[in-house]
């Protein structure tokens, strides 16, 4: 059982490394929306890779939501999009951190798109 989990973790880190390589090849100044999910919560950060700073962040913990299920992921997506738009950011690069674009991750991304962000 330990080897199965280790392989899953290795696969996720390899997927994330592949995504980061693609971002390095793209030479644009768009901020990156980084999604991190745990078993209970979901986190979103807007990162500026040129200056190495966090522009805005939101999470199910910060919004005092009970967990990071799909409904609460939508609320986090709306919140991060509102914060980005208030800082005059309309377009971003999406980084799901090696997680599959499914379930909570896609719900957060769709809510951010509906609120006004362009990926």
Curated annotation (Swiss-Prot):
So what does this one do? Answer: This is one of the proteins that bind and probably mediate the attachment of the 5S RNA into the large ribosomal subunit, where it forms part of the central protuberance.
Entry-linked NCBIfam families:
L18_bact
The record's listing under Gene3D superfamilies reads:
3.30.420.100
Question: What InterPro entries does the record tag this protein with?
Answer: Ribosomal_uL18_bac-type (IPR004389), Ribosomal_uL18_bac/euk (IPR005484)
Question: What organism, scientifically named, is this protein from?
Answer: Malacoplasma penetrans (strain HF-2)
According to its UniProt record, which protein family does this protein belong to?
Answer: Belongs to the universal ribosomal protein uL18 family.
Which protein are we looking at?
Large ribosomal subunit protein uL18
The protein's assembly and partners = Part of the 50S ribosomal subunit; part of the 5S rRNA/L5/L18/L25 subcomplex. Contacts the 5S and 23S rRNAs.
Q: Which GO terms describe its cellular component?
A: cytoplasm; ribonucleoprotein complex; ribosome
Q: Where is the signal peptide?
A: none
Write down the PANTHER family for this protein, in alphabetical order: 39S RIBOSOMAL PROTEIN L18, MITOCHONDRIAL, LARGE RIBOSOMAL SUBUNIT PROTEIN UL18M
Q: Which GO terms describe its molecular function?
A: 5S rRNA binding; structural constituent of ribosome
- Pfam families xrefs: Ribosomal_L18p (PF00861)
The family database entries (CDD domains) matched by this protein are listed as:
Ribosomal_L18_L5e
UniProt KW RNA-binding keyword: yes
One GO BP annotation is: translation
Q: Which UniProt keywords apply?
A: Ribonucleoprotein, Ribosomal protein, RNA-binding, rRNA-binding
